[in-house]
Amino acid sequence: YNLVHNLTAKENVELAAQICSNPLDSETALDSVGLLERANNFPAQLSGGEQQRVSIARALAKRPKLLLCDEPTGALDYNTGRQILKLLQETCRKDKMTVVLITHNGAITPMADHIIRMKSGKIVEDIYNENPKNVEEIEW
């Protein structure tokens, strides 16, 4: 997750936010991924899923126009994965951020407004979903 190992979770988020003109507060970013209470822990003290959430908080703190998420729920349990997907969906809608989510979990595609399926490096399907579902409506 490319965390700096001698910096706390909070410091990792703050480090990324330093390059932005209007970053999200590091504590707000960590709270949004459910890790405010772990802000002063170092990466080695965090589980793989917690490290993944710190990296998501770090990305969100920069308030990007485009957020690339490669398997953002890969190291997360079901409930935490749902929380992160809900956060990404809400951030996308509220902040008008484009979120590109790469996943092997086809069951979550109904939440997307644009779905591109690939096989062997080639696009096999390109669909615009006029009625994306809220994460709460999806089961997998």
Give the label of every model feature segment.
Residues 1-118:
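ABC family nucleotide-binding domain
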Residues 122-140:
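Conserved beta-strand-loop-alpha-helix hinge in the C-terminal portion
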